[in-house]
């Protein structure tokens, strides 16, 4: 009986080890990729966060084209303590003077009276967004910034119009 069991185990071992696994052939079919949604070349998405940063320091546009700018605040702190906006200044405006005047303009969301701006968004807090459309008619390098008190020195960049 032991011999029979030993022979049976040996045969079972030979059968299980002697067979190579079947090699499967894979074929890959080319699949036409669906076009992804393309954002217009004149649409700019600018993100801001609770660390007082914009995700871009240089923005570009073409002369005379309408620019659609979407400002997102990806943080969680409300606009009373960590508000952000986008303000595009006209050429020749002194950034420091403008920012000092903006700090005193709380009732107008830190946008001082006057005609120093080309465009600006509303002040937004964590999880909020604002979208604006504007056109710049002259080529040049303009300054954009956030006018919430204390932010403009870090949250600023160049808006290049070609």
Segments (PLM) and residue ranges:
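Extracytoplasmic/periplasmic copper-protein system
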Residues: 19-44, 90-110, 151-162
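Sec-dependent N-terminal signal peptides
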Residues: 6-9
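Beta-strand cores of secreted/periplasmic/IMS beta-sandwich domains, seen most often
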Residues: 57-81, 86-88, 130-138, 143, ...
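Extracytoplasmic beta-sandwich strand-turn segments characteristic of Greek-key/jelly-roll folds
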Residues: 94-138
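N-terminal edge beta-strand
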Residues: 37-67
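Extracellular/periplasmic metallocenter environments
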Residues: 24-30, 72, 119-162
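Positively charged n-region of N-terminal signal peptides that target proteins for export
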Residues: 1-4
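C-terminal motif of bacterial Sec signal peptides marking the signal peptidase cleavage site
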Residues: 15-16
């Amino acid at each position: 009986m032991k011999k029979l069991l030993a022979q049976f185990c040996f045969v079972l071992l030979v059968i299980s080890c002697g067979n190579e696994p079947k090699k499967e052939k894979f074929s890959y079919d080319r699949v036409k990729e669906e076009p992804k949604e393309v954002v217009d070349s004149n649409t700019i998405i600018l993100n801001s966060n609770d660390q007082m940063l914009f995700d871009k320091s240089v923005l570009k546009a073409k002369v005379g084209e309408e620019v659609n700018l979407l400002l997102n605040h990806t943080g969680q702190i409300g606009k009373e303590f960590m508000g952000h906006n986008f303000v595009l200044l006209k050429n020749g405006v002194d950034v420091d003077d403008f920012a000092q005047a903006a700090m005193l303009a709380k009732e107008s969301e830190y946008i001082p009276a006057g005609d120093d701006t080309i465009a600006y968004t509303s002040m937004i807090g964590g999880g909020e967004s604002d979208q604006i459309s504007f056109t710049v008619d002259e080529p040049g390098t303009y300054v954009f910034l956030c006018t919430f008190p204390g932010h403009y020195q870090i949250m600023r960049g160049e808006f290049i119009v070609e």
